[in-house]
């Protein structure tokens, strides 16, 4: 019936023939793109990664210390750190292969306009969005896979954001990630909430893999944020409860706590995996090894790849990044 090309006596022989057929395929492109650079372990042990994260997810940590435990030799070329400092982007090697990294920078960062003022990180502001959009396009143009490190609460909101046209910048980022053809890998380090999760190559935008850690909190809206929204008419400008009696105050507090607890329960990473919202739940110490495998797979393309030479991007690209979205 011509449904098979070979007839074999047993499974063992069949497996040997399959191995032989695979050996005849074109070899991996990875050795070529290493360009004589041998894979190296990170400068700091990946086993230390979990110690970088505070127990309370509202407390900050240093994303650059996380990167030092993911890239070869801890070497990372950061692009435009002075522009949109709430976002970190640059290139390092994973297993000897160029890899683009884009991550949120938790903690307070200097306000770009109000001198002496600071604003919270883990939020997408205009300049940061412009920077990572341009960087994402640069990586796509050169065929460099991108790793997104999520610790995102969402987009900036309010009159200032509207005046800056933040919606247009956000649309540009979403369009960029929707049209990229390089493999993108998403790692949910701690929290991934709201439209920021989607814009940073979340699962709906088809990353080749989405990894969650054991403390990841994936949600459309953070529990505390939803509680504030639900009880907004009972709160002042500082989100403190306004009530005439202690009984009323306690009732509002219990209601807010109940909303927050329900959403927090739904944020469980194992539950997200069961719902196929993530591909794998991994320990912090395993992230590096997973990235080695995924990045190697990204360079397994047979034949044509768009990386033309060892350059990372052109001088024009660097000039655009320096403009900071202006």
Predicted regions and their residues:
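Ligand-binding clefts of soluble mixed alpha/beta catalytic domains
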Residues: 1-326
